[in-house]
Amino acid sequence: MAHPITITDANFTSEVLDSDVPVLIDFWATWCTPCKMIAPIVEDLTSEYEGRVKVGKVDVDANPVTPGMFGIMSIPTLMVFQGGKAADRIVGYQPKPALKARLDAVLATAR
């Protein structure tokens, strides 16, 4: 089973903006209850989209620069990056089918 990679302020550009494949990023914090609720869904998506989408997680407390660059004010916030640019932003808990639909919509534009 695949797991999300850890994204930091230091590796954000190389892992996300320079990625050859779309990247789903989960901005989260250890104290955030909705973040804990969405975490298993993000884990599932990592496996389901393996090879097509890179999935990563940014701890906003440990890495404040990256969330600040994108105006992250609420967590969880999930962002999809494609070609080095933000392609979608999802704020708050969403059920798995809703997240898959949003991710699939971005992937459809990549074809």
Model region roles, listed by residue range:
Residues 20-21, 28-31, 74:
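Short pre-active-site segment immediately N-terminal to redox-active cysteine/selenocysteine motifs
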Residues 58-66:
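Structural microenvironment flanking redox-active thiols in thiol-disulfide oxidoreductases
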Residues 20-22, 37-58:
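Conserved helix-turn-beta segment immediately C-terminal to the redox Cys motif
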Residues 3, 8, 28, 54-56:
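Conserved Rossmann-like nucleotide-binding pocket used by diverse enzymes
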